[in-house]
């Protein structure tokens, strides 16, 4: 199970990234983190950019709402998602938590 921390209008969870993979994909829960594979190399921030773009498509939220809070130069990262402060944001948080719980 992937631990999700909820702060004021923010969800954070651990992410394990495997760069230079043959395709972008979710591997699943691994070592208390969501493990993903991405095709970009870990050079000049390209892996982080692709990681954010992949999570944006996976979670259905804008790239601007996703930040790498910790581990920008590491395979193990802490990703935070900024959500709107209204009821729609709470529904979005519940949807994302349910999606992550499925891994």
Swiss-Prot record:
InterPro entries cross-referenced by the UniProt entry: DUF167, YggU-like_sf
Pfam families xref list: DUF167
Organism: Desulfosudis oleivorans (strain DSM 6200 / JCM 39069 / Hxd3)
GO cellular component, one term: cytoplasm
Annotated family: Belongs to the UPF0235 family.
Name used for this protein in its record: UPF0235 protein Dole_0289
NCBIfam families, per database record: DUF167 family protein
